[in-house]
Amino acid sequence: MRARLAALFLVLIVEGCVATSSSDGAARKPSSLPLGELLLVGFGGTQVEGNDEVRSLVCDVKVGGLILFERDARSGEARNISSPEQVRQLTSDLQALALLCTGRRLLIAADNEGGAVMRLSTRLGYLPTPPPQALGDAGDPAATALESRRMGATIREAGINWNLAPVVDVAVNPLNPAVVTLGRTFSSDPQQVIIQARAFIQGMHEAGVLTSLKHFPGHGSSRTDSHHGFVDVTETADLTIELAPYRALIKEGLADSIMTAHVFNRGLDPWNPATLSRFTIKRYLRGKLDYKGLVVSDDLLMGAIRQQYGVEEASILALQASVDMLLISQNQGRVERGAAERVIAAIRGALSDGRLSSKALATSIQRVRALRSRITP
């Protein structure tokens, strides 16, 4: 018992020292900005012990968050989640390591939309969950909130505090392969999307789980999937319809965070896809829609980005566009070794040559911290 108390006392001392020294970290000079907090990164392995990759990400890079996946995209084997007991131990150990090394907790994220996209899947012994399309078809927001609350309780029990859901893409194209044909969208009616997303978010909040609206400014009209390559929605997008859920949910204060889409729309930006577009994120989302919260990129290793840009260049462009947190999943069928470290080096270089502003990055870090402060104990 004494040894336990001594260990706890040591952790608290470390936490206090680190927290004190970094409490104003976002206001420091560029060279000492805690840039790792801008990263949400994936990793391999189902445990912390003996995992050098995890230790480096948490203790050296000091990432702001980690994202969990059930399966490895290359091998099909368990990546981070193999059983309810295992994932509880993993997330507990991750938080303990983060507390020891950084004095703060981690944002631990996963995609748990219900139905086809559910990292806590029935294969692992979890209860089945209805796809968003089924909830939208039923048209019963009370039932959606109840289902979301049940799902959220499971997510929180697993130690995941940030659910990258709900999808608020409007099903403009019934043959859309990215979200619509997979049952990931609530409806082709934007008002029904708003009603269902509101209920879903409220259920998650009641369970103590943060959420993320996705994929801004809309992926429901596309004919192709941005996981695999370039997606142009210039001729198919209907912004009046597709932006309605964001406009409503931002106004209601229900947008904990917003995830971007890697879709290109010449009507918004003639040069860059949404994730990398100042016109789309900074001018439209933050300007016209008056969104002040955290923006997280979709995975920067997806085909739509990877085939056109390197992860370093994409990261700089995303930050210039007013994205706050960069998602690097390391689970798109390939792994880029040292990607997190390379991105940090690229950001430092961009700060030095003036392509990035320390003031803007400090604001992004504050948004990450604001979201993290809402993690329930």
Residue ranges of model-derived segments:
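Second-shell residues forming the walls of enzyme active-site clefts
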Residues: E49-E53, E77-L100, Q192-L356
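Surface-exposed loop and adjacent secondary-structure segments within mature catalytic domains
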Residues: G114, T122-A134, R150-T240
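Mid-to-C-terminal alpha-helical segments outside catalytic/metal-binding sites
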Residues: L351-P377
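N-terminal hydrophobic targeting/anchoring segments and the immediately downstream early-domain regions
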Residues: T20-L124, L326-I328, A370
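Sec-dependent signal peptide recognition
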Residues: R2-L8
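Alpha-helical scaffold segments that flank or form the walls of functional sites
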Residues: G139-I160, E242, L317-Q320
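C-terminal motif of bacterial Sec signal peptides marking the signal peptidase cleavage site
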Residues: E15-G16
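Structural recognition of the beta-strand scaffold that forms the well-ordered cores
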Residues: E37-G42, G64-E70, R105-A110, A116-M118, ...
